A protein has these predicted regions:
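Short, conserved secondary-structure transition motifs
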Residues: 37-55
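Short beta-strand-to-turn element immediately C-terminal to the catalytic PLP-Schiff-base lysine
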Residues: 13-16, 113
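Glycine-rich, small/acidic residue-mixed loop/short-helix segments
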Residues: 60-174
Length: 174
């Protein structure tokens, strides 16, 4: 649900079918505006949230993805010893956010390069941010490149577009 620009509240709600239409109509009658999947995806990226299949999958380390906060280390789980080691010493790659310094829209699968032109990673999610009025994205880069403020290049249609690594989330609601 979207209420005017910069006043956003997105929630997935599960309700019995018998009540769904009444709840929907109540939201609309009170000024809420529906938004589509693309709008929801843009808001997800602005918040730095991962999408399974894009930003994370079964092979993704929660440490590399920046998801240590949702990993319960007091309980046993598959590969706990490996994840604990990564927690202690770090991972080779890290998920980062970046903001384009030039016009362009980063998309999943686009290459990330350092300023010397060396391959350093790949875009996992990207969009044009209406809140920031810039192209933004997330991706994985080698940990030596995963420093807030570092400049990188995103390859968009065979053109190198300068971007700056930034902290997540991209957008902070006021």
């Amino acid at each position: 649900v979207h209420r005017r620009q910069r006043q956003m509240c997105i929630r997935d709600s599960y309700v019995p079918n018998a009540h769904a239409e009444k709840i929907w109509n109540s939201l609309i009658d009170n000024g809420a505006e529906p938004c589509g999947l693309a709008a929801r995806n843009t808001l997800r990226i602005e918040m730095g949230y991962c999408l399974y299949g894009n930003d994370i999958d079964d092979s993704t380390s929660p440490i590399a993805a920046g998801l240590r906060w949702c990993t319960e280390f007091s309980k046993d789980f598959v590969s706990k010893d490996i994840i604990e080691q990564q927690k202690a010493v770090g991972t080779n790659n890290k998920r980062v956010g970046f903001v384009l310094n030039e016009r362009g829209i980063p998309r999943q699968g686009y290459s990330l390069k350092d300023v010397a032109g060396n391959d350093i990673g790949i875009v996992t999610s990207g969009t044009q941010s209406p809140s920031l009025e810039k192209g933004i994205g997330m991706g994985y880069v080698g940990r030596e490149h995963a420093i807030v403020g570092n400049n990188i290049n995103v390859i968009i249609r065979n053109k190198s577009i300068l971007a700056t690594i930034t902290s997540l989330p991209f957008y902070h609601a006021s």
